Curated annotation (Swiss-Prot):
Protein's name in the database: Diaminopimelate epimerase
Residues bound to substrate: N13, Q46, N66, G76, N77, N162, N195, E213, R214, G223, T224
EC number(s) given by UniProt: 5.1.1.7
Site residues (Could be important to modulate the pK values of the two catalytic cysteine residues), renumbered to this chain: H164, E213
Record-level GO cellular component terms: cytosol
Disulfide bond positions: none
UniProt enzyme class: isomerase
Record-annotated active site: C75, C222
Leader peptide range in chain numbering: none
Alphabetized NCBIfam families for the sequence: DapF
Compartmental location: Cytoplasm
Length: 295
């Protein structure tokens, strides 16, 4: 059995996208890990899965998996690619889609130039909504001072469908994204782990950002990370509310807009890279892995 897939990216954040509306595949953790291996499989930051809707008021179900095989709640760059993919596959001809994710329903609107606007919902800042358990931390206004390997690190938290910690830095190029990101990602204060953003405010409508993604590592871009960083920046008064804010990442720039009390709106480009097929049984057999139960 061969399964068709499409490789896409949003600002360098790369995805393998599979249509499970017209195809059948039992996704296991082992298979996701193999597919995500850039040497033995296809390779991606996240696997995006299009499934039939589970409820009548949405168009599709949208599932996201990291390379370690874990299913996650949300992916903003992936959402943009999801919208372009279902149109290219002729699964829908709607310009505006409602899709269900593990964290709730989001709306996707595609323009004639291939850019997609995503209604990411309202940001959440309460520790219980992240989730974040700051028992051993010091809080000054909205900032938390978290002990990381004996060193206090000032950070802010937000949930954009998935958990984010954001650190304001003077220069993102000097930020210790790899080691500090890894340490905070798995810190006991974040029971479900956390994505870690390093934000440099250039002016009130421009930030530079690097993100260490939970279960992946640093990526070229992170849509939910950009939304979290801009929402925090607006909440703290560093950025203009209700205006287009340019979030500049390694892979390129996207536009984030947030008026407190309303949804965060994210707009950015997508790109198709190639299409292909793979054999699930062949991959598993090559790796010497016996079939496992579904995720």
């Amino acid at each position: 059995m061969l399964i068709e897939f499409t490789k896409m990216h949003g600002l360098g954040n790369d995805f393998m996208v599979i249509d499970l509306v017209t195809q059948r595949l039992d996704l296991t953790k082992d298979l996701v890990q193999l597919l995500g291996d850039r040497h033995l499989g296809i390779g991606f930051d996240q696997l995006l899965v299009v499934e039939p809707p589970m409820r009548p008021d949405v168009d599709f179900s949208y599932r996201i998996f990291n390379t370690d095989g874990t299913e996650v709640e949300q992916c903003g760059n992936g959402a943009r690619c999801f919208a372009r993919f279902v149109q290219a596959r002729k699964l829908s001809f709607k310009q505006r889609l409602r899709v269900e994710t593990a964290s709730g329903i989001i709306s996707l609107t595609t323009d004639h130039y291939g850019w997609v606007e995503v209604d990411m919902g309202k940001p959440k800042f309460e520790p219980s909504e992240i989730p974040f358990t700051p028992r051993a931390t010091t809080k000054i206004q909205n900032a938390y001072h978290l002990d990381v390997n004996g060193t206090p690190v000032q950070l802010y938290v937000a949930n954009m469908g998935n958990p984010h910690a954001v650190i304001k830095v003077d220069d993102v190029l000097d930020a210790d994204v790899e080691s500090l990101g890894r340490a905070i990602e798995s810190h006991p204060a974040f029971p479900e782990r956390v994505n870690v953003g390093f934000m440099q405010v250039m002016n009130q409508r421009h930030i530079r950002l690097r993100v260490y993604e939970r279960g992946v590592g640093e990526t070229q871009a992170c849509g939910t990370g950009a939304c979290a960083a801009v929402a925090i920046g607006i909440r703290e008064g560093w950025l203009d509310e209700g205006e287009d804010v340019r979030a500049q990442l390694y892979g390129g720039s996207m536009v984030i807009k947030w008026q407190p009390g309303y949804s965060v709106m994210m707009t950015g480009p997508t790109a198709f890279v190639y299409e292909g097929v793979f054999s699930p049984d062949g991959l598993m057999a090559q790796a010497g892995i016996k079939p496992n139960p579904e995720i």
